[in-house]
Amino acid sequence: MSAALLSSAKARFDRSQTRRALRSGVLSARGRRARVANGVHILAGHHMGATEIRDREVFRDLLRHLAKQARLVNIESASRLIAQEQEVDEPMIAFTFDDGFRDCYSHLAPTLEEFGINAALFINPGYVGADAQYVESFNRSVVDLPGKLPMTRDMVSDLAGRGFVIGAHTIDHADLTSSDEDLLKHQIVDCKSAVEEISGTTCDWFAWPYGTYRHISSVALELALDTYDVVFSSDNYPQYSSHGGRVQNRRHFEVDWPQSHVRYFLGQGRSFGA
């Protein structure tokens, strides 16, 4: 690569880092003053962070902090209130986690249980219990998290027995922008029975990978709505639901985010729309 190209790439990287730092500073400043808004909040994370032992303490501290401003509730209760379009006069928070990483079992679930709540865990059956080659490819090419491990099938079954909701997240964390019927049937419909076989429980919930409407075709969304009782996005969070109330919207977060950032996003009100 020429010196000019290297210089240009470095300049773009520096600008990106500057924008990121400025955004973080704004969120921190606003979040320090924010309080969790009244309403039902569903947070959507993925894993416990890069340093799992430390981040279990970070997650515990976050839950303690949020519990001072809101009622932490089981995910079924939160979803039911949204489905019934019930306005609430207090802040309520529930949790979901996608992909099926092993730290959901070893760190996340026990910490949630300390606070008397569960979560919905949306798993990729192709990843759970996969061989080393599949895991390495998934970590590198799909989620960009080298070194992560998936839960085993026994771990998923155990969590289901402990009251965690096990949902579907496609077989292979597929981008569902396709309209190919065979691909969509495999990733959406076949995923339901695959999750049920692993968990030993009925799978009625689905969250599509990447979570935004630009990552799912209208054909794929209709198939998901026909296959599952509840479908979740990670888009359009100010609205409780989308697509005529058939899709419930979650707010992305991660365990290792600063508390002020999480509080900032939870300080935004929600509505059922017109």
Where are these regions (language model features)?
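Aromatic- and acidic-residue-enriched segments that line the glycan-binding/catalytic groove
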Residues: G129-G147
